[in-house]
A protein has these predicted regions:
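Metal-dependent phosphohydrolase cores
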Residues: 1-197
Length: 197
């Protein structure tokens, strides 16, 4: 657990994570944030606002995206939704609030996570894989609906079989360990031994 003796974060704007790490959302600094916190929170966050059946997590989605991109992009793809440890808002909610507004407010958090874990996820290949996963989730986990999904590519051929939060947490951490050598040191990532704090 980090301690800032000069500036105690306000509980109304600070997030307490499973390890005891505190992230102040008004001045986010993810230095020292353990990947185990990200993994556990992503494994506990449902995709689709909880509408998917069986229950399906952001961690599972992230692992799938990491497997659908060229190998050099797999680490960044795994981490592409890591800020959603705060909660995975369904896209229609973000559109209703204003995508630019949501991106602007979340940008400091995402940038802090990018520096901490050393990744750059704004790549068209990652976005395409994200949409393929979305289409696959629609096919495999959600009921048919009278909604236009024309912006989505074809789903992946493999069927999604959700594994539940505990296994999703383990899968995310295993994939992270497999890929962390792809972290970009120029993004100020901390030494590998501190990544697994």
């Amino acid at each position: 657990m980090q301690a800032n003796l000069l500036n105690k974060p306000d509980g109304r704007t600070a997030i307490l994570l499973p390890s005891g790490f505190v992230l102040d959302l008004l001045a986010p600094d993810a230095t020292g944030l353990p990947i185990t916190d990200i993994a556990l929170c992503l494994a506990s966050q449902p995709r689709w606002g909880g509408a998917a059946r069986p229950w399906y997590s952001v961690a599972e989605h992230s692992v799938m995206v990491s497997r659908l991109v060229p190998p050099p992009l797999a680490y960044a793809a795994l981490m592409h939704d890591c800020e959603e440890f705060l909660g995975d808002w369904p896209s229609p909610v973000k559109v209703m609030l204003g995508l630019d507004f949501v991106r602007h407010r979340m940008q400091p958090v995402k940038d802090s996570l990018r520096r901490r874990f050393g990744f750059h996820d704004e790549r068209p290949e990652i976005k395409h894989a994200d949409l393929v996963c979305m289409a696959t989730e629609l096919r495999d986990l959600l009921p048919p609906a009278w909604i236009e999904w024309g912006h989505l590519p074809a789903p992946h051929h493999a069927k999604i079989v959700p594994v539940g939060p505990d296994r999703a947490n383990a899968l995310f951490l295993e994939r992270f360990e497999e890929l962390k050598h792809l972290a970009e040191p120029e993004r100020n990532v901390l030494p590998p031994e501190s990544v697994a704090d």
